[in-house]
């Protein structure tokens, strides 16, 4: 599987971009939010995290490999989860990626079915399915900082963020308050080896 691609951005289209990675030019499909981020990067060197999939019908005899690109690893991970919801799939998920992943994650976490259903390709029924399946998996994405990644001190794959979030909610904090406390602490850039050290830092900041 191709997990990333780096090269010169030579074209930005409506649903895909062209990256020149010598000696080949690759077409990479992107969501609208990523496309907007790349519009001013034509001619520059870029790197996209990628997923590949096969489009077409095996019975029809035409199968076409496709690449989907994301600016950050958490965006790719979110997309992978999004596609796992029954009735979503790759094409529908890609159409829906019109807002930052952090915003989408917050909508899911807060069960905002009305706003979710307004996303391209996502109606009321699908939005309810998305919330039911993904709500508990969203804290780590809802805590993404403005730069795209969870603060460099904390990789998104780490369970520390999710475990700390769960602990704060168990201790009586609201979901939004727990998210804010973690977000502010991670933004300091400090490193945390476990949930206990992150919780300690959070409460030290709150004093």
Swiss-Prot record:
Keywords: Cytoplasm, DNA damage, DNA recombination, DNA repair, DNA-binding. Residues 1-71 are annotated as: Domain I. One of its GO terms (biological process) is SOS response. Residues 156-207 are annotated as: Domain III. It is found in: Cytoplasm. GO terms for molecular function: ATP binding; four-way junction DNA binding; four-way junction helicase activity. Pfam families: HHH_5, RuvA_N. Residues 72-149 are annotated as: Domain II. GO terms for cellular component: cytoplasm; Holliday junction resolvase complex. Residues 150-155 are annotated as: Flexible linker. SUPFAM superfamilies: RuvA domain 2-like (SSF47781). NCBIfam families: ruvA. Homotetramer. Forms an RuvA(8)-RuvB(12)-Holliday junction (HJ) complex. HJ DNA is sandwiched between 2 RuvA tetramers; dsDNA enters through RuvA and exits via RuvB. An RuvB hexamer assembles on each DNA strand where it exits the tetramer. Each RuvB hexamer is contacted by two RuvA subunits (via domain III) on 2 adjacent RuvB subunits; this complex drives branch migration. In the full resolvosome a probable DNA-RuvA(4)-RuvB(12)-RuvC(2) complex forms which resolves the HJ. Has three domains with a flexible linker between the domains II and III and assumes an 'L' shape. Domain III is highly mobile and contacts RuvB. Belongs to the RuvA family. This is Holliday junction branch migration complex subunit RuvA.
